[in-house]
Amino acid sequence: MKYLAGDFDVVVIGAGHAGCEAALASARMGCKTLICTMNLDSIALMACNPNIGGTAKGHLVREIDALGGEMGINIDHTFIQSRMLNTSKGPAVHSLRAQADKKRYSERMKHLLEKEENVVLRQLEVIEIDVEDNEVKGVLTKNGAYFTTKAIILCTGTYLKGKIIIGDIIYSSGPSGLYPANDLSQSLLNLGINLRRFKTGTPARINKRSVDFSKMIEQPGDEKIVPFSFIHNKLDKDQISCYLTYTSEETHKIIHENIHRSPLYNGSIEGVGPRYCPSIEDKIVRFPDKDKHQIFIEPEGENTEELYVGGMSSSLPEDVQIKMYRSVPGLENAEILRTAYAIEYDCIDPQQLDLTLEFKNINGLYGAGQFNGSSGYEEAAAQGLIAGINAVLKIKEKNPLILKRSDAYIGVLIDDLVTKGTNEPYRMMTSRAEYRLLLRQDNADLRLTELGYKVGLVKEDRYNKFLNRKKNVENEIERLRNMQITGKREINEFLLEKGSTELKKPISLYELIKRPELDYFKVEPLDDKRPSLSDDEKEEINIIAKYEGYINKQLEQVEQFKKYEDRLIPKSINYLDIKGLRLEAIQKLEKIKPINIGQASRISGVSPADISVLLIYMERKDREN
């Protein structure tokens, strides 16, 4: 029987990575917030890989942190290994990645919600969204509880009509054996919301005692641990290693012999899977020329023997899986603790949302995370944060927070989802950001903390720390610009030792740092007035000095790009001739044949980076003609 159970400013449905950020943002901005979850023990659950960050995803975590979100702080408290990726490349693609103790990560996030003053946390299933005159009024639960509210944020993850698939075994379920949410989808359809089916998958978990690590390559954490959160100066921890192995010829043979039993290829799976995270059987079919694929063996925590077999997700039958996993060097005697599976679920076409993540046709209804067609914990958390912020700003009748593509990876993520839509689970990549040298992970606070402070998420002590860092960086750059270095004998000897050339005339230390063979750290012996700075401040100063020309060029591009919206594309263009275009972009452009740059830029799978490549090609052709 239906009964009135309470009144809230904001109701968040789902307590995964999107839901947690949405609820914490809403509560910390002063709104009374209800967060509902199917199971209190699955809050911030890492249903797939036990890590946070990675290429482009690390940028998102830093941006979440800079705006006042929780993910970066939580992983800093619960990581078991930390690595900075892509260090051999430029700073635009440096990405922090941390292995998580997945249970502690979940427990700490749950405890935060329990302690948060404006949060009420409940284990219950929402089955209906109540809307009158295109405006949300409340939610109804399976137990009959009705909660009135001004805003609802849907963060349902993979639970909506979730269906687990292992070979020919198919059953209704959420991730990791949890209950699915089978009733809410119909309520959304009744509201005129378009739903679709997506699919994702996860590999098996195996027992550590059954693994022969001597046949694998050890991957320890970095000696110097870099925090995700800007509030942490230094982290120390005994880290746990991951291990690298590869599929074998036998692995590929087993998969080929049983491919007819794969739900991916026999029609059992209807949902669209993630292009950039394919199952092992999909990889072997799609890349027949590759004789081996990387497999990462990753610990799931400090107090468990479970290991995650990264790179080997599958929906093959269990008997095939056992043979397949045991064909991998080091896994010959692997004990499978949890079988790999695929999961299908309902989600929306995100083009039904506007850039605030509110539904265009329903006031007060927001979507975030996998519900919006994205994949990944970090993408979900970023959307949850923005949806939570904007729900509160609307309640308070303030202007929304809309991040542009030139502001943040979060801006790229949301613009791609909302403007272009997606026909497959969307994953953030550095190649999707056309201004990635401006959107580095090291400067996320300089880009976004001011905004976080203005909306009320970044508190005074955090803001003062940010202002101090900003001032230190600006003052040091100014000092370097004004400090003149002359061609004294000892200075020229120092430069020659470093493989640089002698000075013929005075030069600022700032300009000297720009030389390819030098940097801010190497010129320290020439700088007796150098102030005491933190490691991250020094790194920031070095990047700004070294890449100033490129950074200024991208700032100009931000303004210039607007001019090309209506630029016509020649009918005779051959996209295969354009170096730098990704294969996916070539396929989509060839198929749709857009008539102008504006149309091309809105095609799903064609990134703004691809558009930049296309424009450069067209301009070169114009000059040649």
From Swiss-Prot:
SMART domains: GIDA_assoc_3. Its cofactor is FAD. NAD(+) binds at residues 273-287. It comes from the Bacteria. Its main location: cytoplasm. The keyword Cytoplasm applies. GO terms for molecular function: flavin adenine dinucleotide binding. The keyword Transport does not apply. FAD binds at G14, A15, G16, H17, A18, G19. It is found in: Cytoplasm. GO terms for biological process: tRNA methylation; tRNA wobble uridine modification. SUPFAM superfamilies: FAD/NAD(P)-binding domain (SSF51905). Keywords: Cytoplasm, FAD, Flavoprotein, NAD, tRNA processing. GO terms for cellular component: cytosol. It holds the Pfam family GIDA. NCBIfam families: mnmG_gidA (TIGR00136). NAD-binding protein involved in the addition of a carboxymethylaminomethyl (cmnm) group at the wobble position (U34) of certain tRNAs, forming tRNA-cmnm(5)s(2)U34. Homodimer. Heterotetramer of two MnmE and two MnmG subunits. Belongs to the MnmG family. This is tRNA uridine 5-carboxymethylaminomethyl modification enzyme MnmG. It comes from Clostridium botulinum (strain Okra / Type B1). The gene is mnmG.
